[in-house]
Amino acid sequence: MKSMRMVGALICLGVLVAGCGGTQELLRPTRSDKLYEAVTARGSQLVSVIDSRSHSTDRRLPLGVPTGDWRHIYSIVSTSLIDTDPQTGATRSSIQLQGTYQLPPATANGLPGGLSPNGQWLVVEAFDGSANGMPSSTHMLVIDTTTSRVWRKIDLGGYFRFDAVSNDGDRLYLIQHLNGKEYYVRLYDVIGGKLDDNIVVDKSDGNQAMVGTRLSGVATPDGHWLFSMYVREHESPFIHALSLDGPYAFCLDLPGHGYVDSGAEMHWSLAINRDGSRLYAVNPATGAVAVISPGANDAPAVLRTARFDKAMSVAGSASAANAAVVSADGATLVVGGPAGIAWIDTASLRVRAHALADWSVSSLGLSPGEQNLYAIGDDGRIAVISMATTSVSAKFDPAEGRPMSLMRVAAA
């Protein structure tokens, strides 16, 4: 029974010698990008905005959930919801939540979520404790970000976690925890103010209760589907394809094993192409890649899978947020993992290049014009790689803290 638990285009010309313990550079880029990196530093989580050319930090922002256009980043400080302008660090607005709420986690390593795909609706959550450790009741606020007002307050008996909210704000999808492992996916009617009596089931086999650990998720550009990457203790990984238009979902099995049997299963990443016509699930630690049809006019389905040479090492972080990107033309899938970076041709699903074989890469990001690929290592170092030649043009350490994710790359 399937189940889920939340648990630049510069060519390297040579090597410049750096002083002992200093930054090692190959060639300082002539153009500059701004890297928005989520880090943990001195007990706090924040977003450091790093200049790729000077290697200096321009500003630090509170860690939060950004809108797709990156005009807003929402965070919670004490009992206030703060709307910050990521471009300047200035506070756009602040509202009192009348209680202690938190942003729902979107990834296994704690990146915040809670936004609808279009950024109009934000859900925050709070819980009442109980003697057995599992919360006895759940409280949620649905906030209209266009007016900065609480639109609905939701109180439920039992332990529920946010899964997704539709673009119109009418449908809220929740994870109802039954015990320490099993749970249901439930649909909450925001307008009617009640849980749908029916459980959101896997339409491929009718299963209701789910188990597994969610690693990350990606929504289609049109906001109709949410795809979440799940791994299980003793069974193969799968993608949970949740329709945001109704009470149904599909579970798409992937090749592999349980993460208790193989820790390499924790290195799955998801990436979707620009028009949303293809989703890729890839694991460089096991050497597996799958192509998925997101189901614009049909049910989502795994179209094909392939194997490639897996990483020789499976050390490194097993809690990265996501480490895969697709080029704008859809021809190349790039994935990072415990043995560097691999470039995969999406037509043949064959690896055509490697880089940073001695790095454990936890996150990737493409520059706006796709001249450069930026890679974040588990140790906090950043590498700049030419997408055209796959050569490394620079490496530096911003010394900002323990990396969580490269959330955004923007032109300077």
Question: Locations of the language-model features?
Answer:
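Short loop/turn segments that connect beta-strands within beta-propeller blades
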Residues: 52-55, 86-89, 144-148, 189-193, ...
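C-terminal motif of bacterial Sec signal peptides marking the signal peptidase cleavage site
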Residues: 17-19
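Short coil/turn segments that connect the beta-strands within blades of beta-propeller domains
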Residues: 33-35, 70-71, 118-120, 168-170, ...
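Blade-level signature of beta-propeller repeat domains, shared across WD40, Kelch, NHL, RCC1
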Residues: 375-412
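Short, solvent-exposed loop/turn segments at conserved positions within beta-propeller repeat blades
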Residues: 42-43, 76, 131-137, 178-183, ...
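An edge-strand/N-cap motif at the start of beta-rich repeat modules
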Residues: 23-62, 68-74
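Repeated scaffold domains used in trafficking and secretory/extracellular systems
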Residues: 23-28, 60-72, 100-115, 158-166, ...
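A short beta-strand motif characteristic of beta-propeller blades
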Residues: 51-62, 90-104, 149-155, 194-208, ...
